[in-house]
Curated annotation (Swiss-Prot):
This is Small ribosomal subunit protein uS4. The keyword Cell membrane does not apply. SMART domains: Ribosomal_S4, S4. GO terms for molecular function: rRNA binding; structural constituent of ribosome. It comes from the Bacteria.
Length: 208
């Protein structure tokens, strides 16, 4: 599947917020001024308030880029979320959080979602003891995710673990960083996820 391979800082500046596309080795401010619009005139340009549609579109783009998903696949996630019981917006976030690459990232085995996706694609990840190389694979409750033996000494994994130790461990995951494995205990509740995401704007956009 095609992926965006351009400058990640440009995407963050376009959305005006940290999309968590870079590792936490340095602060985002030292790498990318998210308050400045991209382009040669970005330093002097003003971020306009925008229309209702514009705000909805930007929110969709922001979430899509946070999880590293292209438009066609994002629409499929939305369609699936709308067919489930409950809040469509919360269902959408749940589907995104249950992606294998995202769970690998949340467990601290990859310093970014892009790196976690690469670990999955390169067959470095085991799901319940079996190799799964599909980043979009939906993880279920009580599934065990672990690092394949031959990949455990990769420097990028060790660096990611060092960064993970500096942050709070998600409550919906049971992680053993020494054994390089973890269990997906439950689908995270909405209040356990970022409050910066306004999923209702995405629902409004696709409901038009």
């Amino acid at each position: 599947m095609a992926r965006y391979t351009g400058p990640t800082c440009k995407l963050a500046r376009r959305e005006g917020t940290d999309l968590f596309l870079k590792s936490g080795i340095r602060s985002l401010d030292s790498k990318c001024n998210v308050t400045q619009l991209p382009g040669m005139h970005g330093a002097n340009a003003r971020r306009q308030k925008g229309t209702e549609y514009g705000l909805q579109l930007r929110e969709k783009q922001k979430v899509r880029r946070i999880y590293g998903i292209l438009e066609k696949q994002f629409r499929l996630y939305y369609k699936k979320a709308s067919q489930k019981k409950g809040s469509t917006g919360e269902n959408l976030l749940s589907l995104l959080e249950c992606r294998l690459d995202n769970v690998v990232y949340r467990m601290g085995f990859g310093s970014t979602r892009a790196e976690a996706r690469q670990l999955v694609s390169h067959k470095s990840i085991l799901m319940n003891g079996l190799v799964v190389n599909i980043p979009s694979y939906q993880v279920s409750v009580n599934d065990e995710i672990s690092i394949r033996e031959k990949a455990k000494k990769q420097s990028r994994i060790q660096l990611a673990l060092e960064l993970a130790e500096q942050s709070t461990q998600p409550q919906w995951l049971d992680i053993d960083h020494k054994a390089l494995k973890g269990v997906f205990k439950n689908v995270p509740a909405r209040d356990e996820l970022s409050s910066d995401i306004q999923e209702h704007l995405i629902v409004e956009l696709y409901s038009k």
